[in-house]
């Protein structure tokens, strides 16, 4: 069966919304960006367009009564949107993002990596670190880093995918080889149970439309004072190669 990804989104208003827009524009207007027309070649004829539209309309119609859409309709967020009364949690927020220049720079230019912006928060940890990272590949340096945090008295808990729940087994292999050393260092590890899709929460299924679940959310909670929600995984490819 298809996997249902357990993800996490955040709704932000005010200055951070403008910052996200600025980051998007930086990529949209970058020299490496090019229009879709550069890939499409010649424009499709009317028959092709009509056929694609018919396929699209049929797909949309088939999803109208899906478990997923039904869950959205019944969600508290949906009700709040309909009532025009979204309950927000107010707090200080900051947008951090890789710059497009990262794509053109040498791989060892760590000052261009998003991880360098987050490093001060990790270095300042005093009590607790909770990590959700579906594609978690700490490497030897990561094992040492988390082990040192534990020695400093920081309670480190990491949630990632199990072999049965991951959609990228190769990445899981990169994590599994360090699992024993992480546990020996005092790190608490929790792996996603793909059968969690059948569990209920508040009368609504946590994952719908599939009998198998996979973790996809990326977030870090630091000392219960700071939270990072984004696209960054704790693995070398995400830190060095990707733009997050």
Short names for language-model regions:
Residues 1-244:
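Charged, low-complexity intrinsically disordered terminal segments
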